[in-house]
Amino acid sequence: MKIELDMYQTLALAVLVLMLGKFLRERVRLLDKFCIPAPVIGGVLFAIFTCICYVTGVAEFAFDDTLKEVCMVMFFTSVGFQANLKVLKSGGKAMIVFLGVVIVLIVSQNFLAVGLANLLDVDPLVGLCTGSIPMVGGHGTAGAFGPVLEDFGIKGATTLCTAAATYGLIAGSMMGGPLGKMLIERHHLLDTIVPEDDSLLVEEEIKHERHSSMYPAASFQLIIAMGIGTVLSKLLSLTGMTFPIYIGAMIAAACIRNLGEYGGKFTVYMGEINDIGGICLSLFLGMAMITLKIWQLAELALPLVVLLAGQTLFMILYVVLVVFNIMGHDYDAAVIVSGTCGFGMGATPNAMANMQAVCDKYSPSVKAYLLIPLVGSLFADFINSLVITVFINFI
């Protein structure tokens, strides 16, 4: 029996799955501890249900994912609005240095993924399913690039990317705090703590205050950026390279944001844009998760384990040997290490949870609380999308 859902029914089911995930996360402490997104919790359960139905021959589900693409583009447009060059400049040398460290991390994750895939004699694009797409990118980027890789002939790429992203969330949360603690105690870093000015954090918080009357204007800015983005995407396609559908919208949004910041002729309503983007991300993830075909993971189970183990070992070595030393070899650097594990293998909320755990035990770190969310949220996703696009087109 085949059960077909139109785009409205698919959206409604995604919302129900989202609500189920939120309900379970509020009641299962472990899910909340690891910051597992509500759409992932409910979506995995539904995907298991559809897998059982498929394997037993009871039913097969077919979904209309038209609205999934709309929500995906709107979310990544909101990410594009985060690319504020003024913030990058105000962060000073430390911001530039950390951004460079993150760029190297993104590129290295993909080189490692492709290299291990070649050693395992699997398609390099399968390797990319465990690279920076799910690691730095998380579930949002996994859901966006999975279909792109499927268009290149990688069956079940979305499922692979999502499985890797879920693993990354858990692994990044589990190792961030312990690594930070180890570095602090091994190198006696409490002696390196110095008082810092938190005015930049306060300034950003004020800028992102929400006003209900501004949500329509924020929506219009998002829609305009999406419209301009379609033109940019068509122009980019003339290069012969394959780009994700949202890349033009991200570039348009970044241009609008910086025109507003530097020109001063109009206001970009970032708080409201962030909220709308967050809603679209939840809906996009909900629809992406219910369409997972987890039975496609079976034949790639062993390569997937090896690829993810390689990424985990690399992350530990990278943050301890590179991030810690380049960022100052002090207490702040140790807290940054814990945060980098969070967003380098999962998402920025995991990074913040890791840092909070370390800071609650020892001392606050204004530097870490400034760098991690700004680089992790504002610039990492934007740069990651560009790097992934290059890898997909040239391997």
Where is each model-derived feature located?
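Alpha-helical transmembrane segments
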Residues: 69-70, 161-178, 242-249, 307-314, ...
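Entry/N-cap segments of selected transmembrane alpha helices
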Residues: 70, 84-114, 219-222, 275, ...
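Juxtamembrane and boundary regions of transmembrane helices in multi-pass small-molecule transporters
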Residues: 115-122, 165-202, 313, 321-331, ...
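Alpha-helical membrane segments and immediately flanking helix-loop junctions
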Residues: 116-160, 167, 179, 194-195, ...
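Membrane-embedded translocation segments of transport machinery
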Residues: 230-308, 314, 319-326, 339, ...
